[in-house]
Amino acid sequence: MIQATIRRSHDKGILSFEMTGHANFAEHGQDLVCAGVTAVVFGAVNAVIVLAGFEPLLDIGEDGGYFYFEFPESLDPEARQKAQLLIEGMIVSLETIERDYKDNLRVTTNII
């Protein structure tokens, strides 16, 4: 199962998100859940880089079972606002996938 964990603060919105695990919906190379989650996450992160104009802190696992995104501490408020909206859109898409594939994807939010 892919576990998506979103970290939020009370006042700054999304701080980071982490993806761990594998969907195990189908064999490697044919796993539609994995492909969907990957497309949503990479699309959102690429949109943040291009449209919000900054490089987030990223850690991408070598075997494909790990992805970490974090907003930098010092970030222009306008860039943060754009990126927050893009990542919120990513979360909505992940939750939509989760609705149909509960055994393969779990999205949780931690407020700190």
From Swiss-Prot:
Which organism was this protein described from? Answer: Bacillus subtilis (strain 168)
User: What EC numbers are recorded for this enzyme?
Assistant: 3.4.22.-
Can you provide one Gene Ontology molecular function annotated for this UniProt record? cysteine-type peptidase activity
* Signal peptide, first to last residue: none
Q: What class of enzyme is it?
A: hydrolase
Keywords for the protein's UniProt record, in alphabetical order: Hydrolase, Protease, Ribosome biogenesis, Thiol protease
Query: Does the record carry Nucleotide-binding as a key word?
Result: no
Quote the subunit structure annotation. Homodimer.
Q: What does this protein do?
A: An essential cysteine protease that cleaves the N-terminus from ribosomal protein bL27.
Q: Which GO terms describe its biological process?
A: proteolysis; ribosome biogenesis
Pfam family example for this protein? Peptidase_Prp
Question: In which family does this protein belong, per the annotation?
Answer: Belongs to the Prp family.
Q: Which SUPFAM superfamilies match?
A: TM1457-like
Supply the source organism's classification.
Answer: Bacteria, Bacillati, Bacillota, Bacilli, Bacillales
What InterPro entries does the record point to? Peptidase_Prp, Peptidase_Prp_sf
For this entry, the protein name equals Ribosomal processing cysteine protease Prp
Disulfide connectivity?
none
Q: Which residues are responsible for catalysis? A: H22 (proton donor), C34 (nucleophile)
